[in-house]
């Protein structure tokens, strides 16, 4: 098959669901592509693995390959997912921790109701106001069905990527917060300079070695509200987002569904509405292997839409 035909086939595989009754929630296929490329096609249900878990799994796979072929050290044993999960559940049952988490979100909600902003402007919010008969509604309807997705791939040149990384190092900010600021700037521009922008940000919850190496899916998803005034600089906005996100990280084990319920109860949101018009998940993948035995082998990664 040609490269476009193989890519179309893998795209098709990615649209196929999993049989949930007594069957694996993953697909591993060894592939051989034109041009001498060989590798793996992976499709994994998000309920059992997130992108961070996938990165660690593949890194361990490469290390095991080099261990058996070249005699290099084997990777360290990963943490036990069940033990890490039990630790999570014990923390979740701590009443003092739950109260601190709940108080943190109630404090954020005391700033007032957010407003929905969309990359297409105010049209979606206006349609939601009409459909609910609420001219002052500040939340918009979420699209539940269909769930089909698509992907637009944008490749940043290495020189520009290096500039962004240097900027982040210079100002001690993360790439995720820089991207959040870029996204909220675009949403503000599309909504007549609206300063109050809410996004949804994914948190990996992998701060400790045990949580980093245990595999599975540990992501939680929380609102990220930013109110950046027009006279603020781009860096001011990033630092504001950084401070906001640092607060959320300290409460990242709190149930996101309870956060959603707090928003709905506080502001009387109609069912299936939201304040966030976009979401960000940021898990950078390396463009080359750090393994010294594999540095001569080019690495190519392709994402497929589910």
Protein language model features and the residues they cover:
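Active-site-proximal acidic secondary-structure segment that organizes catalysis
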Residues: 26-83
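Acyl activation and transfer enzymes in specialized metabolism, enriched
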Residues: 42-59, 146-192, 231, 249-253
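His-Asp-centered acyl/peptidyl-transfer active-site segments
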Residues: 36-37, 92-102, 167-176, 190-300
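Short beta-strand or tight-loop elements
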Residues: 21-27, 276, 297-299, 306
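A generic secondary-structure signal for well-formed alpha-helical elements
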Residues: 61-72, 109-116, 186-191, 226, ...
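Short amphipathic alpha-helices and their capping loops
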Residues: 1-4, 24, 80-150, 232
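Acyl-thioester-dependent condensation/acyltransferase catalytic cores
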Residues: 1-42, 49-52, 114, 150-156
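Short amphipathic C-terminal alpha-helix that caps PH/PH-like domains
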Residues: 10, 54-65, 238-245
